[in-house]
Amino acid sequence: MKKRRKVTSNLEKIHLGYHKDSSEGNVAVECDQVTYTHSAGRPTPEALHCYQELPPSPDQRKLLSSLQYNKNLLKYLNDDRQKQPSFCDLLIIVEGKEFSAHKVVVAVGSSYFHACLSKNPSTDVVTLDHVTHSVFQHLLEFLYTSEFFVYKYEIPLVLEAAKFLDIIDAVKLLNNENVAPFHSELTEKSSPEETLNELTGRLSNNHQCKFCSRHFCYKKSLENHLAKTHRSLLLGKKHGLKMLERSFSARRSKRNRKCPVKFDDTSDDEQESGDGSDNLNQENFDKEKSDRNDSEDPGSEYNAEEDELEEEMSDEYSDIEEQSEKDHNDAEEEPEAGDSVGNVHEGLTPVVIQNSNKKILQCPKCDKTFDRIGKYESHTRVHTGEKPFECDICHQRYSTKSNLTVHRKKHSNETEFHKKEHKCPYCNKLHASKKTLAKHVKRFHPENAQEFISIKKTKSESWKCDICKKSFTRRPHLEEHMILHSQDKPFKCTYCEEHFKSRFARLKHQEKFHLGPFPCDICGRQFNDTGNLKRHIECTHGGKRKWTCFICGKSVRERTTLKEHLRIHSGEKPHLCSICGQSFRHGSSYRLHLRVHHDDKRYECDECGKTFIRHDHLTKHKKIHSGEKAHQCEECGKCFGRRDHLTVHYKSVHLGEKVWQKYKATFHQCDVCKKIFKGKSSLEMHFRTHSGEKPYKCQICNQSFRIKKTLTKHLVIHSDARPFNCQHCNATFKRKDKLKYHIDHVHEIKSPDDPLSTSEEKLVSLPVEYSSDDKIFQTETKQYMDQPKVYQSEAKTMLQNVSAEVCVPVTLVPVQMPDTPSDLVRHTTTLPPSSHEILSPQPQSTDYPRAADLAFLEKYTLTPQPANIVHPVRPEQMLDPREQSYLGTLLGLDSTTGVQNISTNEHHS
């Protein structure tokens, strides 16, 4: 029997990117008692041949796993849900706030979501009612990051919500079961500065110096290190000897340059202990701290054209020092250089130089010149070490009074005392700001000023992000920028519990939700943030129009406005509708267009219930109900409610253009009864007659109506108000149509300015196309032309069918009231036998224009309305003799007085 090959039975687990054992560089495999090795990177041909001879066996398989893939997968999913567009397929709404998520993530992490999505797999939106949005945000971030970043007082709320949503892992974590404590993350997440330090400590030191093998977090730090420490090796041997000789001079012999501890990759045993090392480490730490304190806006970038020596050096301490020195010098009445020199130390007598009628004092020690004796005497104390000014609190002495003034502010609470953190690289003197340090180098080390400037220039070069390649002028800005590429949100809002990745995002949030709105003092317009307010004031009220079109010369206030204006010349319409293919020049026009497809008519008229897509359309429509006619024709004085109507009127009447042919109405036909309507809303309102839908319900009597306007009129019944008063008598009415009926039939007054009746309105506003081959519109036009005959024949037929016993109220007169003189009472007339002669209409003019032209001209021109259309009394409108009291009420008469209906027989008798 063939000897069975022996293979290592244990499965080797190889972690990608990590060594199992630093001592194991090879993997050994035994085959036919012959052990051979091959490098982990590339096996030998003999090994491959041996493996090929082995029969398939599970023991020969190797398990390859990546420890980073799990975290990376969650990271990719978390980054994806924060992008637009993303692969998220679920929208979770909590307290009106929307959260995008992936169904698979929330379903796996929460049994609540698993049950909801299993029951309704096609659900795209889930609304939570028992959880606050701030607590749910913590839970959602836990599902994507497996971490909580909460305050201690928030833990009970998050734990309760986790139990409600059945997120088991979160419940265990918050109960501290089988997990490590949160340490400071649960209790104290102190300041953004500490978070930046932690973030910096987590960065890998992947930049190594080739001269001293030290590691740095940033490439820029390495460049600064080379410029400072190994500058001689970079500039050449000759210049290098000079730099080395200078670097190891007596002043700097005790200083051993070392990187800060958090950037140094060496062990603690290798770090040298001593005053020089400690001082340097403290210096670098203080310098970094000063850089952080100087930075105010993480996204701001400094102008490269600023002076290298004064860049970022403005400091409150230096300003106080300069101001104090200025005040001190101004307060002292110093004699000029030509006057007698006071008490000057022996050997420091100044050299007097006569220069253009002005004497200058020159120091014999340092050749520095002064124009006043007081300044020179103060300068001599630098060489003598004399300090005549003493602090009365701590008894510390100073050489100048200005320095003592600055020192005294340390004991008071007037201003914050700034520590001197900036050390001169040539004499180790400390300064409070970079500005005073730069002045010190130019004054006392002029031979090293050029080198100092070159170092500053190297430092001022941009710091670049390795991920997005964005550049910054300062390292603290880059460190804050790196937070954007992580999951940290160290900046907490002082007004709520929201956290943000940057100070700028936090500021925008505070201005929008807590501090705003910010009104303009000039026009009163409100803005969400101060930036938009400032831009509005500059551009709108400041008269700035700095953006000019190079094609037509038009000037605009905003760059975005100019960009959109240029599309007029180029014809570019970048916003394409994916539904209908229509393109738009502006994004706002495209968003308004989308409402057409989504039937998003969010603006509703309060009077008639008609809905509109745009607010300006609703504003124009409301003028129909208000009767406002603010646009007047300058030629004839006719007023219109809309400006476009005035334009059409002016062009058609006064200019003679046939503008109305451009305005052809859109018609909608009912599928049930084939009636045609002008507007879509009118068709929808009509269709309710077939469907029986009555969406408008009275809350008092539960009666329903098809039209909102009918409900509005109905609500007057439930109130005691009678807002419509008759101008000719004391009668009041609840409805306007009742008042009009009363005026027409009781007082027999009809104003020529009254709006058309219902029948007239139907005739005039009948929409008709102008094409002669359209049968539908020709038929409607013919109906309009024959309409007077229809009324006449209808009246005759109606009266012929009326029974002789029914009295027809042809002429209605007021009944004598108690206060009315008898001689003013009119006699009533009765209906003679030939009733058709009484209702015979007046002769009609047959030379009507076309119906469409009539409808248009009556709307936009001066053509009078036809007022001679007869309104016959229909049988269903006739009153029963027993209901005479209702007619009296309708006409505004006294309820106790009936209306006299005299029959024909009574008249003959």
Curated annotation (Swiss-Prot):
Q: Where is the stretch described as Disordered?
A: 252-344
The UniProt record lists the BTB domain at: 88-152
Which Pfam families does the protein's record reference?
Answer: BTB (PF00651), zf-C2H2 (PF00096)
Localization per record:
Nucleus
Listed transmembrane segments: none
Q: Which keywords does the record carry?
A: DNA-binding, Metal-binding, Nucleus, Repeat, Transcription, Transcription regulation, Zinc, Zinc-finger
Question: Which residues form the C2H2-type zinc fingers?
Answer: 207-230, 361-383, 389-411, 422-445, 463-485, 491-514, 518-541, 547-569, 575-597, 603-625, 631-654, 668-690, 696-718, 724-747
Single annotated GO MF: DNA-binding transcription factor activity, RNA polymerase II-specific
InterPro entries named in the record: BTB/POZ_dom, SKP1/BTB/POZ_sf, Znf_C2H2_sf, Znf_C2H2_type
The GO cellular component terms are: nucleus
Q: Where is the composition biased (Acidic residues)?
A: 266-275, 296-322
Role of this protein? May be involved in transcriptional regulation.
Protein name per the record = Zinc finger and BTB domain-containing protein 41
Source species taxonomy: Eukaryota, Metazoa, Chordata, Craniata, Vertebrata
